[in-house]
Amino acid sequence: MKLHELKPAEGSRKQRNRVGRGIGSGNGKTAGKGHKGQNARSGGGVRPGFEGGQNPLFRRLPKRGFTNINRKEYAIVNLDALNRFEDGAEVTTALLLETGLVSNEKAGIKVLGNGTLNKKLTVKAHKFSASAKEAIENAGGTTEVI
């Protein structure tokens, strides 16, 4: 077998269906849009969530809550992810970004207590959950809020 003899598997490549190219093609004239009506027109069709005039779901349900414009979103790191560092290492935001555990620092880094930590680490972050702080200190490490 040579490179120029390679062919895709039978049925793996489907040819694009060109509509509106003569009645002999089977998809000419109305091009699969049927006769007249909103969907046959240029730019026709209904918006997402439109229910044909029936009161739509998003209007039937009550309004609730608000969006806090001052909301802070923290980048999250769990305890089990911190096990990759050597025993006695100092884990900083720069180190977390460098290793790829955090791709975007956002408003800061918060350490959560999911998983187990079996290394003695000094962890510097903006926030710690109570369970994460307890687990780090139980492993012999220290936490520092920056």
From Swiss-Prot:
Keywords: Ribonucleoprotein, Ribosomal protein, RNA-binding, rRNA-binding. Binds to the 23S rRNA. Disulfide bonds: none annotated. Residues 1-60 are annotated as: Disordered. The keyword RNA-binding applies. Residues 21-31, 42-52 have a biased composition (Gly residues). It holds the Pfam family Ribosomal_L27A. Residues 1-13 have a biased composition (Basic and acidic residues). The keyword Ribonucleoprotein applies. Belongs to the universal ribosomal protein uL15 family. It comes from Lysinibacillus sphaericus (strain C3-41). Part of the 50S ribosomal subunit. One of its GO terms (biological process) is translation. One of its GO terms (molecular function) is structural constituent of ribosome. InterPro entries: Ribosomal_uL15, Ribosomal_uL15/eL18, Ribosomal_uL15/eL18_sf, Ribosomal_uL15_bac-type, Ribosomal_uL15_CS. SUPFAM superfamilies: Ribosomal proteins L15p and L18e (SSF52080). It comes from the Bacteria. This is Large ribosomal subunit protein uL15. One of its GO terms (cellular component) is cytosolic large ribosomal subunit.
